A protein has these predicted regions:
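Residue-level recognition of single "structural anchor" positions
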Residues: 1-197
Length: 197
């Protein structure tokens, strides 16, 4: 996994989002095409589900990465752990896979199993809202190929972080994010594009 541009810390909500595996646009010999909306053939969490691990620092940064199929192992979460600051307060659901990561980072955890355990401060509403955005966008795009899911994760993060901004602020945000990656030669062309439709 490459170095992340920023980390999340202090109060962090962590959770997973599962989407069906999709090889859209690629014909695979011996594999029957799956029509949109049909369920997976295996029940529950299996290798037919892609896991998007999400960590959100409240009011600031979001990190979403896809590392594996099905339920993430503790090794997957340790690889994801480079984006988590040490000694953070982490709120998560009842998954035991996070224990090794949180111990290695010396983090305090709060397990929130159901909505009855939520209060004003301890909740997973932010990460669940982000997962709802992912679900809506994937439905709007009519599915995306799983090999590109991390690119779409980056797009979803940018859409979340620019919610409520006007187009000028969004343009400044994009330019700041692209500052060290690409050199934009014509700002006029970029202003005319609908980056966040």
């Amino acid at each position: 996994m490459r170095n992340v541009p920023y980390t999340v810390g202090n109060e962090v909500e962590m959770d997973e989002k599962y989407t069906p595996y999709n090889h859209k646009g690629t014909k695979i010999d011996g594999v029957e095409p799956k029509h949109r909306g049909t369920p997976a053939t295996k029940r529950g969490l299996s290798n037919q589900q892609i896991c998007i691990i999400t960590a959100i620092q409240r009011f600031t940064h979001t990190i979403a990465r896809t590392l594996n199929y099905g339920k993430p192992s503790s090794l997957d979460l340790l690889r994801f752990g480079e984006c988590l600051e040490s000694k953070s307060f982490v709120m998560l659901d009842g998954s035991n896979s996070y224990n090794e990561l949180l111990e290695s980072k010396n983090c305090t955890k709060k397990v929130l199993i159901s909505h009855e355990s939520y209060d004003k401060f301890n909740h997973l509403n932010t990460v669940n809202s982000f997962h709802k955005l992912i679900e809506e966008r994937l439905q709007k795009y009519k599915g995306v190929a799983s090999k590109y899911i991390n690119r779409y994760n980056a797009l979803f993060i940018m859409q979340r972080e620019t919610q409520g901004m006007d187009n000028t602020e969004k343009l400044q945000y994009v330019l700041l994010r692209l500052k060290n990656i690409y050199k934009i030669t014509r700002l006029k062309d970029l202003k005319n594009e609908w980056l966040f439709a």
